[in-house]
Amino acid sequence: MKNSFYKSIPTCAWSRAIGLGWDKPYTVRKDSNIDDGPWHGIPLGGFGAGCVGRSSRGDFNFWHIDGGEHTFQNISASQFSVFENSNNKNVVYALSTEANTEPNSNASLSAWKWYPTSASEDDSTGGYHALYPRSWFVYENVFQAQLSCEQFSPVWAENYQESSY
């Protein structure tokens, strides 16, 4: 992951190539409502305000909107997308590496062009970087433009009210 044009990502941030899975993902020893597996990302949302999560694949996949309720499910129709026209060539992608393949998912989304998954850390289509309360997606080797997406969850010391929005 080059990350060269986006200097504000701290070097201590956790980083992973976009969409790259794990050979041996960690699994908990017993069922837990906290650990849904390896495809988690930094939550979006303030303390006590509910949250939505976006994984290193780019999909929105968990949320805690109703107090005490936890849902982990890929929401394929909720995606960022990019249209680029460069040198009379159009490039269009939903910025997630795959659609929801679960039963009862929206099959019409299979027509979407999903962002290419990184083949390896060295042969990457970009990177996901996380250091709470921020995370970044840096998209590389696909678009002509340099593209990144930064998310921020509000945390203010000694100010619970603004931290809960």
Over which residues does each language-model region extend?
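Beta-strand-rich N-terminal accessory domains
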Residues: 1-109
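Extended, loop-rich substrate-binding clefts of extracytoplasmic carbohydrate-active enzymes
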Residues: 101-165
